[in-house]
Amino acid sequence: MKVYTGIDIIETERIKKSLEDKNFITRVFTEKEITYCESRRNDARIQSYSARFAAKEAAYKAISEIFEPEIKIDWKQIEIIIDETKRPKVNLKFESEKIKNLSIDVSLSHIKEYAVASAVAVYEEKSE
């Protein structure tokens, strides 16, 4: 078993400026993420996008060593959703046998100026 971690912090003002470009939104976020964030209003909308951006970065940092260089992971292949218990969850949207042996936990937090996320990935290497 190997444990991998990732963390990221982002200024919400940076994401606010990026959100002015529709291409940024559709390039980085999935439909589920966009629907969730757009359901929020004012600062909560920006904080939601910012937290998801940080979570994608943190998750990428935690899993990239496991999957790359075989798989080039892009933004929309890491999806951050809220599960039925109201906790953030990572959905990996690419095919790999390694996903079966992987568990990822993510934690998000934000205030007006910053969003931060941490990710912990536990990978059970199966010997053949």
Question: Would you name each region that the model predicts?
Answer:
Residues 1-128:
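Core catalytic alpha/beta fold that binds nucleotide/phospho-ligands
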